[in-house]
């Protein structure tokens, strides 16, 4: 199989799948005819091709996964044909809780409530509905509490590739102290 064909197979798989996909998953689909490094090179070639041609489709990187999506430069046109989800804006309490989860993850509901000083059931439900957090398992201690993490949707919302791109939390503590 030619390298160019493999690049187009990767492109087709990503288009059909629609969700973020890892290099390992792509490698499995291609039957390991290429190394992970070669698949990453192919992905980077596709990303660059789309970028250079200013195409309506782009490939974005989210943590260690890649996803094909529409180019945000053309969002106004996409909105005309797709009924946008009616997502209500997030309250201050919801944003605070999301921030806590983003910086402290994995974290339990009790730990969130200890930091905020109030119950957070409704806030967590809102974050689930907006697909900004997910259950990431359970702690191995009494009661087996659920632990929460942010999702790829959270990364997309902030237009970042990984949590490492979040600003250092010290910056926020300085602002809070100065107010």
From Swiss-Prot:
Question: Highest taxon of the source?
Answer: Bacteria
| GO cellular component, as recorded | cytoplasm
Family as reported in the entry's similarity comment: Belongs to the ScpB family.
Matches recorded under InterPro entries: ScpB_csome_segregation, WH-like_DNA-bd_sf, WH_DNA-bd_sf
- Point out the signal peptide segment: none
> What's the name of the protein?
Segregation and condensation protein B
User: What functional role does this protein have?
Assistant: Participates in chromosomal partition during cell division. May act via the formation of a condensin-like complex containing Smc and ScpA that pull DNA away from mid-cell into both cell halves.
**What Pfam families does this protein's entry cite?**
SMC_ScpB
Q: Which Gene3D superfamilies match?
A: Winged helix-like DNA-binding domain superfamily/Winged helix DNA-binding domain
Alphabetically sorted, this entry's keywords are: Cell cycle, Cell division, Chromosome partition, Cytoplasm
Q: How does it assemble?
A: Homodimer. Homodimerization may be required to stabilize the binding of ScpA to the Smc head domains. Component of a cohesin-like complex composed of ScpA, ScpB and the Smc homodimer, in which ScpA and ScpB bind to the head domain of Smc. The presence of the three proteins is required for the association of the complex with DNA.
Give the NCBIfam families listed for this entry.
SMC-Scp complex subunit ScpB
Query: Which Gene Ontology biological process is one annotated for this entry?
Result: chromosome separation
Where found? Cytoplasm
């Amino acid at each position: 199989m030619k390298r160019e064909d493999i690049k187009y197979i990767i492109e087709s798989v990503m288009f059909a799948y629609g969700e973020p996909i890892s290099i390992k998953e792509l490698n499995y689909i291609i039957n390991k005819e290429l190394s992970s490094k070669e698949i990453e090179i192919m992905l980077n070639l596709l990303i660059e091709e789309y970028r250079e041609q200013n195409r309506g489709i782009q490939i974005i990187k989210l943590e260690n996964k890649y996803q094909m999506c529409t180019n945000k430069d053309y969002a106004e046109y996409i909105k005309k044909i797709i009924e946008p989800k009616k997502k209500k804006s997030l309250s201050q309490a919801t944003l605070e809780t999301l921030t806590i989860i983003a910086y402290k993850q994995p974290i339990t509901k009790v730990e969130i409530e200890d930091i905020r000083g109030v119950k957070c059931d409704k806030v967590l439900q809102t974050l689930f509905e907006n697909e900004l957090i997910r259950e990431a398992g359970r702690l191995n201690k009494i009661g087996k509490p659920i632990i929460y993490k942010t999702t790829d949707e959270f990364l997309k919302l902030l237009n970042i590739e990984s949590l490492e791109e979040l600003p250092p939390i010290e910056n926020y503590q300085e602002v809070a102290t100065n107010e």
